[in-house]
Structure formats: structure tokens, C-alpha cells
UniProtKB/Swiss-Prot annotation:
Signal peptide: none
Keywords linked to the UniProt accession: Isoprene biosynthesis, Magnesium, Metal-binding, Thiamine biosynthesis, Thiamine pyrophosphate, Transferase
Cysteine disulfide links: none
SMART domains documented for this protein: Transket_pyr
Gene from which the chain derives: dxs
A Pfam family of this chain: Transketolase_C
Protein name: 1-deoxy-D-xylulose-5-phosphate synthase
Length: 629
């Protein structure tokens, strides 16, 4: 066993290439065992980067040399050889290793990651810092072909080419996303080859060659030479024009070739681009056969009861149904057709479906352009990724009052993916925008109605936020109906306290009301439905009736839903005790969604206990009523 002897990258340097190859096999076995059998997580990407990881750590000297991994989907082998082998079984578990890169987790994690296309910018900053401070170390950015579709990556490449500082960019090309880019270059070169002047020159050269002895043979050789040259040009021209020396393509599973290549590029004093070809899912045949399906893996519990449909699937199916009745509906996603539930829509309406790649800024403005021409674009993007297009939401959509629908999946606490993926800021960053309508469903059935509402709303942009995972199991009967804009839902009436809950916290709020009822406390419960516009009338009536109020949200408290309710009360001159429950001013790490909600104090038991303490503090109940909680 070689893996058990690797406590740091320095240990790799004592191994021969054949021993490194055996180590690669052991690393794959460890990833398969842990990810498939224990923790879940990103699977196929990590299997594809084992040899690349070993070669980088064999040639370079981390942590002195800076290896910056993009996104982090491919960082498990890196974690295994940088002193975290003994904790690898805790990956993505509460209190365990992160599934992504975190600077505080290891000195070998030089830059935190979770979102795509950031590695080259960060690595370039480190390379420039070395030059300014007179330090001597190598800087390497490792980026996948999927992340390379992000515009930020090209901004960084352009800047690096201009600065001409030593920087190594490694493209991990598993052919999952780069084909459209290559196709665009191919189309450009095709236009050159079909230009009249080019074709005339080609005919004249061939005519002259045929006059020579062995002329036909020379013509054949010229064609073969041009074909080879064309292939080289396709691969190298863009990187050379950006100011990089291009090397590749390299077999990403040939350790000897990788090591020799990296030893060579260590000597460069200007930007170099190393093109590495890998197989996503390498070493696990089902993942090699279907890397898309095996991009990430979830642990399956034998005998587990069936779960309700996932929010993303309810969204996707409802959109298909609505699109059948309205040919103006189009769907847009940024490289997440499966995660957003849009694969059925893509299959049913391929001409009305657009996957723009990792390009959220473009996705939003593209949707705005579609909306100017009378179409009804639905832009389905994870809440955390919509942050990347905030200026476009303001400048290109809200200012122009364009009817774009923003379907924000993974809103709230997402679980094991952790701090980079929680969608907890959207309420604050969207409710402040003029012309924006913002709503959140309490369950999967209400999601159907809110999607219908959004598509019926033509007066400007409208956003709906909904959580990751399965719904709550309510029946979904009848056609989706249009809800009144800005109208909340009164779920139960009481006179002791009013609980106003948003989205996924409505059901826990109802359960908390049941707990309070056991203590003789009668609570009004309101499903807010809308953050903007708020149902001012219902909220103010409940506040006056009860004399105190609790808000609950699975979002950041600062600037959030509770703040909107406080503003409404203040504007009405209604000064009553208010308790805001939501996410405190910190980043939440990875854990199960249930655990994270307990940490945040927004599960049913926490809502009830905190409400009891709140009522006692303000003299609404006797302190003894909460003594046993």
C-alpha cells in the first residue's frame, strides 16, 4: 500500500513512476469507496484528475509553489496527498473536510473555491505578488474545460498575456464543455478557407505543382501538410494570440509524459498554457460510460422510503406543461440543465431551450434581449450563482422593467456543499431593486402556482426562490393557478403572537405553532408568499391583534425578509416587540440541511423555544412556562 505512506507531497518525490502509477490506482479505490459508499460528493471529475494531481505535486513544491484549483470539483486527490488522508472519510460531513478548497483547512489550499472560472485570476494575482515582493515560487492554475467557458477566465488570460509574468495554466480537458468553443474557431477558419482569394490561390498552387515530376504526389502531400497545420492552428492560435506558449495536448493519464512536461514548463519565465486530455470518471466504467450522470454521487440508503418529488423536478415539469400552452416561453440555464430540472424542457422544446455555459452574466442579459421581443424567458439559475450577474439584473432587466422570470433553485441552506453554495443572500440583494417582484413557495404545490403567476406577470421582472431537495409531500392537484401579486396566506389565527414565515420555513412555523398551542399559546401563522410587495394589510392587522410578532426566513437576516417587515411596521408607526429568526451574520459550513437549520434556529423546535423566550422577555408569558425547554 502506497497511499498510507503519503502524508505530504514531499513523500511523492521518493516514488518511481511505476510506484506512482500504483498509487494512482489506490487513490481511485479510496475515492470510489468513500464517495459512493459513505459521503457522496463530486465523483467523476475527481477520478479524472488523479495522475494530473500526482504529477503536479511530484514536480512542484507545495505549499511554496502555489497550485490553484478551479471550482474544487477535482480536488479530492489533492486532499488525499496533502495530509488529509486520515480524514478523507469525513468529506462533506458536518465537522469534516470540505468538499471544496478552503484556505483554513490546509496550507496546500492556496485559494478557496466553489464557483467556477476564478483560478486564473487568483493565480495571476499570486504570480504578480511574487514579482513585486521578489519571491521565487511557481504559480499554477488548474482549470477544467467547463470552467473555461466562463468569461472571467478569458479576462484573466488576456491580462496574464499582457503582463507576461511567469504563470502556468493547465487546462484539464475532459471534452465535456469545450466542443462549442472549438466549433466556433473551426467555423472561423472555414470562412477563411472558403474565401474566394484563398481558393483561387490554392487552385493556382496545385496547378503549378502538377507540372513538376511526381506532381500528384506533391499535391497529396500538400493536402496532408495543410490538414496537420490546420489542426495545430486550431489548438494553438487562440492561446498564442493571448500571449501564452501553448504545449499539448498531453495525455492526462500518462504520468511520465505529465512529469516531463511540467519539468519543462518550470523553466519558462512567461505565461504557458498546458493542454491536458483526461477521461472524466477514469477507472470506474459506469462513470466513464456516462460521466454526466456520475458527475456527483449521492449515497443511497437501502430500504429507504420513497421521497416526494424534488423542487427542481416539479419546476421543470410545470414549465413543460405551461410551455405547451404558450409558445413564447423559453428557458435558459448556465451549464446546469439537470440540476435546475430543465432536461425535460430541453427534450420537449429544444429550439426554446438555451444552455449558455458558465456565463451567468450573459444568461441574464440574453434573457433581457429575448424579453424585449415579446418572449417570456425563464432564467433558471442557482441562487448562489445569480450573485455573479447582479449588475445585469439591475442594469439590463430591472431598469428596463423587462418581464424576465428568475427561477432561483437551491435557495436557502443547501447542505453538504457548504458556504460557497448556500443561497442565502438573494432576499436581501433582490428586494432592494425597484421593479422587482420576489416570492417564495411554502411547498412544491405552491411552486407550481408561483411559476404560473410569474409567467402571467408582464409588468416587469419577477423572481421565485425555492430550496434544494424533496418537497414536503403535499398533493399536487389541478392546473397551476395565478396568485394575486403581494397577497399573503393566513394559515391560522391566534391572539398571543403572530408568526410570519417565508418559503421553506412556513411548515416549521406551523409545527412550532402546534408546540406553542400545547403550552396554551395561540399563534397566528401567515405564509408571506411575497417578500416584495409585502402584504402590508394582513401583516399590520396581525401585528395589531397580537401585539408582538415573529418573522422566520431561511435567508440572511441583514436586509432580509424580517427587515422588510420591520420597515413596514415602522412606516405604519406601529411599535411592537419583534423577533427576527433567520441566518446570523456569518457563513455556514457544510452539514446536512436539517443540522444547518437547527444551527440557524429555524427548525420547528427552535422556532417554538425562541418564541417562548421572546414572549417571556416581553412579559407576555410567565418565565416558568419555558423552564423545561
Amino acid at each position: 500500500m502506497y497511499l498510507e505512506r503519503i502524508d505530504s507531497p514531499q513523500d511523492l518525490k521518493r516514488l518511481s513512476v511505476p510506484e506512482l502509477e500504483k498509487l494512482a490506482e489506490e487513490i481511485r479505490e479510496a475515492i470510489i469507496e468513500v464517495v459512493l459508499g459513505k459521503t457522496g460528493g463530486h465523483f467523476a471529475p475527481n477520478l479524472g484528475t488523479v495522475e494530473l494531481t500526482l504529477a503536479l505535486h511530484y514536480v512542484f513544491d507545495s505549499p511554496r509553489d502555489k497550485i490553484v484549483w478551479d471550482v474544487g470539483h477535482q480536488a479530492y486527490p489533492h486532499k488525499l496527498v496533502t495530509g488529509r488522508r486520515d480524514r478523507f472519510h469525513t468529506i462533506r460531513q458536518e465537522g469534516g473536510l470540505s468538499g471544496f478548497l478552503q484556505r483554513e483547512e490546509s496550507p496546500h489550499d492556496h485559494f478557496g473555491a466553489g464557483h467556477a472560472s476564478t483560478s486564473i485570476s487568483a493565480a495571476l494575482g499570486m504570480a504578480v505578488a511574487a514579482k513585486l515582493r521578489g519571491d521565487r515560487y511557481h504559480t499554477i492554475a488548474v482549470i477544467g474545460d467547463g470552467a473555461l467557458t466562463g468569461g472571467m477566465a478569458y479576462e484573466a488570460l488576456n491580462h496574464a498575456g499582457a503582463l507576461q509574468v511567469p504563470l502556468i495554466v493547465v487546462l484539464n480537458d475532459n471534452e465535456m464543455s469545450i466542443a462549442p468553443n472549438v466549433g466556433a474557431l473551426a467555423r472561423y477558419l472555414t470562412r477563411v478557407r472558403t474565401d474566394t482569394r484563398y481558393r483561387q490561390a490554392k487552385v493556382e498552387i496545385e496547378r503549378l505543382l502538377r507540372r513538376l515530376p511526381q506532381g500528384e504526389r506533391l499535391v497529396e502531400l500538400s493536402h496532408r501538410f495543410l490538414d496537420g497545420l490546420k489542426e495545430v492552428v486550431y489548438r494553438t492560435m487562440i492561446w498564442e494570440e493571448l500571449g501564452f506558449t501553448y504545449i499539448g495536448p498531453i495525455d492526462g493519464h500518462n504520468l511520465r509524459e505529465l512529469i516531463e512536461t511540467f519539468q519543462l514548463v518550470k523553466t519558462f519565465d512567461s505565461p504557458v498554457f498546458v493542454h491536458v486530455l483526461t477521461v472524466k470518471g477514469k477507472g470506474y466504467q459506469p462513470a466513464e460510460d456516462d460521466p454526466f450522470k456520475h458527475h456527483s454521487a449521492a449515497v443511497k440508503v437501502p430500504g429507504a422510503p420513497p421521497t416526494p418529488p424534488r423542487y427542481q423536478d416539479v419546476f421543470g415539469q410545470t414549465l413543460v406543461e405551461l410551455a405547451a400552452k404558450n409558445d413564447r416561453i423559453v428557458a435558459i440555464t448556465a451549464a446546469m440543465p439537470d440540476g435546475t430540472g430543465l432536461l425535460p424542457f430541453a427534450a420537449a422544446y429544444p429550439d426554446r431551450f438555451f444552455d449558455v455555459g458558465i456565463a451567468e452574466q450573459h444568461a441574464v442579459t440574453f434573457a433581457a434581449g429575448l424579453a424585449t421581443q415579446g418572449l417570456r424567458p425563464v432564467c433558471a439559475i442557482y441562487s448562489t450563482f445569480l450573485q455573479r450577474a447582479y449588475d445585469q439584473v439591475i442594469h439590463d432587466v430591472c431598469i428596463q422593467k423587462l418581464p424576465v422570470v428568475f427561477a432561483m433553485d437551491r435557495a436557502g441552506l443547501v447542505g453538504e456543499d457548504g458556504r460557497t453554495h448556500h443561497g442565502v443572500f438573494d432576499v436581501a440583494y433582490l428586494r432592494c431593486l425597484p421593479n422587482m417582484v420576489l416570492m417564495a413557495p411554502k411547498d412544491e404545490d405552491e411552486l407550481r402556482h408561483m411559476l404560473a403567476t410569474a409567467l402571467a406577470y408582464e409588468e416587469g421582472p419577477i423572481a421565485l426562490r425555492y430550496p434544494r431537495g424533496s418537497g414536503v409531500g403535499v398533493p399536487m392537484l389541478g392546473e397551476p393557478r395565478v396568485l394575486p401579486i403581494g397577497r399573503a396566506e393566513l394559515l391560522r389565527e391566534g391572539s398571543d403572537v403572530a408568526i410570519v414565515a417565508l418559503g421553506a420555513t412556513v411548515l416549521p412555523a406551523e409545527r412550532a405553532a402546534d408546540i406553542l398551542a400545547e403550552r396554551g399559546i395561540r399563534a397566528t401563522v401567515i405564509n408571506a408568499r411575497f417578500v416584495k410587495p409585502l402584504d402590508r394589510s394582513l401583516i399590520l392587522d396581525a401585528a395589531r391583534e397580537c401585539g408582538c410578532l415573529v418573522t422566520v426566513e431561511e435567508a440572511q437576516l441583514a436586509g432580509g425578509f424580517g427587515s422588510a417587515v420591520l420597515e413596514t411596521l415602522a412606516d405604519a408607526g406601529l411599535l411592537i416587540p419583534v423577533l427576527r429568526l433567520g441566518l446570523a451574520d456569518r457563513f455556514f459550513d457544510h452539514a446536512s440541511q436539517a443540522s444547518l437549520r437547527r444551527q440557524a434556529g429555524i427548525d420547528a423546535e427552535s422556532i417554538a423555544s425562541r418564541t417562548l423566550a421572546f414572549l417571556a422577555t416581553h412579559g407576555r408569558i410567565e418565565t416558568g412556562a419555558i423552564s423545561d425547554r
